[in-house]
């Protein structure tokens, strides 16, 4: 009996054109020409479930950069960790999210490719250009800081976790952007001392980064992406607004 009910459901679905709704986070391939070369980049694109029913709304966008373990040519691996993994079960997440995949053997340094990808998404979707944010973990955290350093007028805020090899020389430009940095005191892969040097450089340049030191935590602090407060904070940041006084470290 159960078998015949299943068959009936399938037949009715075919007759009436019913089908399962597509996933909100879909894989894409980006091909484009930047000066003197072609770029080929796989990425996941998350669009909130309510996007289609809110035609007057321009949405904030998060650019998510994964860590070194997700490099390669299988975009589905990006879906299994960090913010993309969270999105698999949150169709009403209130941001559009772009999650590119870094090619094998490379790190996040291709500014032209990333900026061109963002331009493409902004062309195709209703994006609030004043509320574009960048985040990442480990190698992706370093990439987020680097892209913010190279493109200081693009991003309204930066949120990074367990950042690998941050560069204090970036402090001057990063001081102009709202920053929230998370780092574990027991991180053996990305020592917290390196992040403290960057924070000092940013503060010396007049910046007010928010720096959360996570006592006893190691490199794997991706559960930070489950904290609602970080998204509330992101939405409070808007490009062109003054960087506010330094909030308390918590």
Where on the chain are the PLM-derived regions?
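Conserved alpha/beta-hydrolase "acid-adjacent" motif
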Residues: 188-194
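Short beta-strand/loop motif that positions the catalytic acidic residue
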Residues: 180-183, 187
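Gly/Ser-rich "nucleophile elbow"/oxyanion-hole loop immediately N-terminal to the catalytic nucleophile
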Residues: 49-57, 106-139
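Active-site machinery of serine-nucleophile hydrolases
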Residues: 61, 65-116
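A domain-start/cap signature at the N-terminus of enzymes
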Residues: 15-61, 135-137, 142, 147, ...
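Post-His helix in hydrolase/transferase enzymes
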Residues: 222-232
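Primarily recognizes the serine-hydrolase "nucleophile elbow" in alpha/beta-hydrolase
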Residues: 122-124, 130-175
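Histidine-bearing beta->alpha loop at or near hydrolase active sites
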Residues: 97, 184, 214-221
């Amino acid at each position: 009996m159960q078998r015949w009910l299943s068959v009936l459901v399938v037949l009715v679905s075919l007759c009436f054109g019913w089908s399962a709704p597509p996933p909100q986070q879909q894989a894409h391939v980006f091909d484009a020409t930047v000066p003197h070369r072609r770029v080929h980049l796989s990425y996941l694109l998350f669009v909130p479930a309510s996007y289609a029913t809110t035609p007057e709304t321009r949405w904030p966008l998060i650019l998510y950069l994964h860590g070194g373990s997700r490099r390669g040519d299988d975009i589905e691996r990006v879906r299994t960790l960090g913010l993309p993994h969270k999105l698999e079960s949150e169709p009403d997440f209130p941001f559009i999210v772009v999650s590119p995949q870094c090619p094998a053997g490379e790190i996040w340094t291709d500014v032209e490719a990333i900026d061109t990808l963002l331009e493409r998404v902004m062309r195709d979707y209703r994006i609030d250009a004043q509320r574009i944010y960048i985040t990442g973990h480990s190698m992706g955290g370093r990439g987020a800081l680097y892209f913010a350093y190279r493109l200081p007028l693009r991003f309204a805020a930066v949120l990074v976790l367990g950042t690998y090899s941050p560069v204090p020389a970036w402090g001057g430009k990063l001081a102009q952007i709202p920053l929230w940095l998370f780092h574990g005191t027991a991180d053996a892969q990305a020592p917290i001392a390196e992040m403290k040097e960057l924070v000092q450089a940013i503060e010396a340049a007049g910046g007010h980064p928010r720096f959360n030191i996570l006592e006893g935590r190691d490199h794997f602090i991706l559960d930070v992406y489950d904290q609602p407060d970080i998204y509330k904070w992101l939405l409070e940041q808007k490009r062109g607004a003054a960087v506010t006084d330094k909030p308390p470290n918590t």
